Amino acid sequence: MKVKGRVVRGLLTVMAIKALLLSPRIVKAAGPPDTNWMSYNGTVNGQRYSPLDQINVQNVASLTEVCRFKIDDSGTFQAGLVQIDGTLYMTNAHDTLAVDATNCTVRWRNVYKPEQEDVFQINRGVAFANGKLFRGTPDARLLAIDAASGKTLWQQQIGDPTVGEFLSSVPAIWQGLLIAGTAGSDWGIRGRIMAYEQESGREVWRFNTIPRGKELGADTWKDPNSARYGGGGSWTTYTLDMASGEVFAPVGNPAPDFVPSHRPGANLFTDSMVVLDVRTGAIKWWHQMAPNDGLDLDLAAAPMLYWNSKGHPMVVMGSKDGYLYGVDRETRKRVFATPVTTLKKAERSPDARGVYTCPGPVGGVEWNGPAYDQMTKQIVIGSVDWCATIKSDEVEFQPGKLMLAGKWDWDAAKTGWVIAVDPDSGAVKWKYHADSPVVAGITPTAGGVTFTGDMGGNFLAFESATGKVLLKTATGGALAGGVITYALGGKQYVAITSGNVSRLSFGENGKPSLVVYALAAGGQAAATTLATQTATPAGAATAALPPDAGRGMELYGKNCAACHGNKGEGVSGPALKGVHSKLDFAATVNWIENPSAKMPKLYPSTLDAQAVADVAAYVMGL
């Protein structure tokens, strides 16, 4: 009887355990574990793939806005977002911010005060390592910031802004080192890539992207004098192979941009991917896309590493020339070159008559490159479809001045693409034609959904396997930076940058804002218009205070200099020097408020009436 009693008690215990395990509280599906987005492209190999699947093909249409935070009233917002342990880190030209990743509450804000005049007010984000954030500045400083407090730990001048050098890219992180490069190709700098100690900012090594003297590649500059100001800057972050200790760096265009005859030869290492030993900076190999480029077709986005179906290590690059290039890392041979936008190559180099080319100088693949979808085994890339007529001019080198030696006229129409490509052959698997340029980050997920956005302000979600649009929702501002996903507290989030003014801008640009999405309770679909993103009433077109040219200079730098030049010398937009001899103050205000179709419309959503008056006052003094 004792044995029988023990058996009965045992059976009852088993039944009780089963009942407990089957109770609704226990069997309810657990949310995903907390996950971070550690770097500009998520991982150092550049793949941007997320293993999260709470948001999937079946429910992505029910994404809704959780919160948003306006980081500034105007200007560029192209930063790649980073999320570490519940905090989102982001930047604009001068500010670094830490924001709660679930409710957009600001934790701290670090404001950098330039020590010299900015070259170009742009920044692409921060790198994170050992509790520190690292970023560059428009006056060529490298900063280390405490991630917990926002306090600046050290800063190091690593370039000379008086000759056009600045830092727009996110440093790469490798075993106590920071790898960063100077931007400023179009100003006629001599580009270089450098490594610095994370603890002190001390330089460890450097590699000159424009070789001279006995350096490898110097013979590709047939006129050695032209290499003094040959360009070759770095616009964006680098990619790392942690196992081999290699850094894959995209290198920008040669200078002058539009007169290749001034610099005969292949002009290494411009428009190239260079592979360096991360320990020493020694070059291992390179792949050049556009020798002796005369159309500003630089490599502006980070390469991406993956393995093809045959087990070969591959590197893929999206270029401003409109191609996606796949290169076998073992043979160092090109495997495919797939067009990812409209192609119409100019038949000759630019001249005073002008040459028509597709893509134009701000077309093709811009600062966010290809992603790799591990679920569908495909590469996904966004691009800009925008043609232009380029005219060359006299070459004049003045340190610190733009050295385009020409200008361009855009086509009125500009669109974009999101394209999925077979990683073995480069064959196109599907494509989506967007109504506006696509430059935002591409993020595939294990939920079978790929996220991105366009410069028309649309946040997009695709079915990864087919390219079917599952969600298209207005954010109130152009998407030009990070699109990332992470999980906190059992919930998957998607965070984006919305609101940007740049040479790719048009229409309503919106105010630079962080926007965070998650699945809505009850499956409510995301709204296609946002009441929280309101514009200044059109009738409020009178400045309340006298125009302030000093404030106007600051606003001009954020919103106008990309097209018109820091000093109004003209870039892709017309020169504004001496505009006071053609327009009075009222006419200048009217021109800003009612621009041509080729200009961004900044009023009233980005600049209010007071800001317009301030900018007009500054422009009148150029």
Residue ranges with predicted function:
Residues 10-23:
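Bacterial N-terminal signal peptides
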Residues 34-41, 74-94, 118-142, 166-190, ...:
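Repeat-blade elements of multi-bladed beta-propeller folds
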Residues 145, 191-202, 266-281, 332, ...:
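Beta-propeller blade signature
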